[in-house]
């Protein structure tokens, strides 16, 4: 009996070992599934999952399948840090999320400790200014997107009112734009702070309206952007409302309704661009809802990881992180990245982007802008 039990134990151990080998690329999704970041986190997670399903269906990476877990940060930086620590201790190969800048700023110390590649949707300039060699963006940081935005504002407005959310994301954008506009033809005439999760925008909108600025820059997270747009229209503001991706995303348009019409934004990722249309259709078929830039971030980030692992040719976290920094990846080599992309040594990415205006409830691309540091 003892021999039989021993044999069974050995067989069970081998079975578990075989299972681990078959699924030895472990990914942790650490995202905002509750709290103010629910929209961004859910779509980002869905994009990652969609890419994983596709990659596994086509044979995995280096013949290995991907397994993944999903955890909710509750849009809380402390929770995000604890979950990242847990993922590192569980020996995951890579981490996707958090999406919010305030959370990744706190949690990335743990992925650095574990030498674990960490893909984030966070856009605050400070995220990649910490010298963490394991953090990579899935969308523009403010140091890449805002110079393009500032050039556009210079051509449209002599005076500008700035409405921003008082968190790492909002303050980072406001500070970056302020510096870029110093000494230019555009003067900032109002600096209006709002709270994360703010419901009532009447006072902030009234302040902006009273400046009579040529244009108003709105830099808040998705749900707040929709509330702000509704209030601008309610107060009869006719001036140009300009922002970044979070002003004209699909969720914002759904929540703001007609109030979103006329809003303009510099957008790095949109399902309305030809490069992303097929992704948008696949996402809608899978999740019965529209994706926005967050879904594309998660999806393309997973394919960047795939391309980097294949470039290295082995499952070595440190080598894979090094293979992303200072490198370019093409759609010819890895179609799933959807658009050619280059990373610098800090983990910031650069690629083409778009100027979008909401017309009749749909984001319409007015112009395609080249990569900021386009390689000749």
Residue positions per predicted region:
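Sec/Tat signal peptide C-region and signal peptidase I cleavage site
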Residues: 16-22
């Amino acid at each position: 009996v003892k021999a039989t039990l021993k044999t069974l134990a050995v067989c069970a151990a081998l079975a578990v070992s075989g299972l681990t080998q078959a699924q030895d690329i472990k990914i942790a999704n650490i995202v905002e599934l509750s709290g103010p970041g629910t929209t961004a986190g859910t779509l980002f997670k869905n994009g990652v999952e969609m890419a994983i399903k596709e990659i596994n269906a086509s044979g995995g990476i280096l013949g290995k399948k991907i397994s993944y877990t999903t955890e909710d940060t509750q849009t809380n930086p402390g929770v995000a840090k604890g979950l990242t620590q847990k993922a590192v201790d569980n020996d995951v190969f890579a981490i996707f999320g958090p999406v919010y800048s305030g959370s990744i700023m706190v949690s990335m110390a743990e992925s650095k400790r574990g030498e674990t590649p960490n893909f984030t949707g966070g856009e605050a300039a400070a995220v990649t200014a910490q010298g963490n060699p394991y953090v990579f963006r899935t969308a523009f940081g403010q140091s890449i997107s805002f110079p393009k935005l500032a050039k556009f504002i210079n051509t449209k407005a002599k005076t500008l009112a700035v409405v921003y959310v008082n968190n790492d994301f909002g303050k980072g954008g406001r500070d970056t734009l302020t510096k870029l506009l110093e000494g230019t033809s555009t003067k900032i005439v109002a600096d209006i702070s709002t709270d994360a999760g703010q419901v009532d925008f009447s006072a902030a909108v009234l302040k902006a309206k009273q400046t009579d600025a040529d244009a108003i820059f709105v830099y808040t997270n998705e749900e707040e952007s929709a509330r702000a747009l509704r209030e601008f229209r309610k107060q009869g503001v006719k001036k140009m409302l300009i922002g970044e991706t979070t002003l004209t995303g699909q969720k914002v348009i759904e929540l703001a309704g007609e109030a979103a019409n006329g809003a303009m934004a510099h957008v790095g990722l949109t399902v309305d661009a030809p490069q992303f249309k097929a992704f948008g259709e696949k996402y809608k078929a899978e999740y019965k809802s529209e994706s926005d830039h967050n879904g594309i971030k998660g999806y393309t980030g997973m394919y960047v990881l795939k391309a980097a692992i294949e470039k290295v040719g082995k499952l070595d976290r440190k080598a894979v992180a090094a293979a992303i920094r200072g490198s370019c990846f093409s759609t010819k080599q890895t179609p799933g990245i959807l658009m050619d992309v280059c990373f610098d040594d800090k983990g910031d990415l650069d690629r083409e982007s778009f100027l979008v205006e909401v017309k009749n409830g749909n984001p319409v691309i007015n112009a395609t802008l080249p990569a900021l540091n386009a390689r000749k």
